[in-house]
Amino acid sequence: MNQSVTREQRDGICILSLNRPDKLNAIDATMISDLNHALAVTLDCPDDRVILLRGEGRAFCSGNDLEASEAQAACGIARADVQTHADALQAISRKLMLGDKPVVGAIHGWAVGAGFEWALNCDLTVWGRCSRAFFPELGLGLFPTGGVLSLLPRVVGLARTREMILLGEKYDAQTLQSLGLANRVVPDEQVMETALSVAGQ
């Protein structure tokens, strides 16, 4: 069975790839566990100087795996399990933001919900020109994690943060760049090449 997160070392750059392309890299419990582990290993590895986070297939990350969530809900979920899930998501954000190695995000296709949060947790991001991102959580009866409620107001202001979270509107890469949420916007086919170049600096 394929790992939901793969790890590749290349000249001091550790490439972490979300690897559920058939699900547009939707986040399930296995991916959360695998990414937490991969980040811990990478942060502890002296050969890795920079982390590059990307997604396999047609999207960076389409957010929570709703099919998996619905299946869990049908079986009944204990409050403690919900808290464990949220804590594990927060642990990823802490590693991305507070780890001692810079993180470059290579974002293409969709970055949705927690996937958008992970993109915003990166120190530098390269977005494909056709990329789109949004927060659907409130419409699904959920709430954003990943520290975005602390991060976003500092960058885009309180009014825009409220719009992004409460309305769940979709943003293109150029708009995100104008808001200070994307460093570089390049043709889709140049995302990985550009991200590697940035990471190599």
Task: Spell out what each predicted region is.
Residues 55-95, 111, 141:
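Glycine- (often His-adjacent) and acidic-residue-rich active-site loop
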Residues 21-24, 58, 63, 130-132, ...:
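A short, glycine- and basic residue-enriched loop/turn
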Residues 31-34, 85-88, 191:
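Hydrophobic alpha-helical membrane-association signature
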Residues 1-56, 94:
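Conserved CoA-thioester-binding segment of acyl-CoA-metabolizing enzymes
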Residues 94-201:
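Crotonase-fold acyl-CoA enzyme core
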Residues 16, 20, 34-35, 53, ...:
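Terminal peptide-recognition signature
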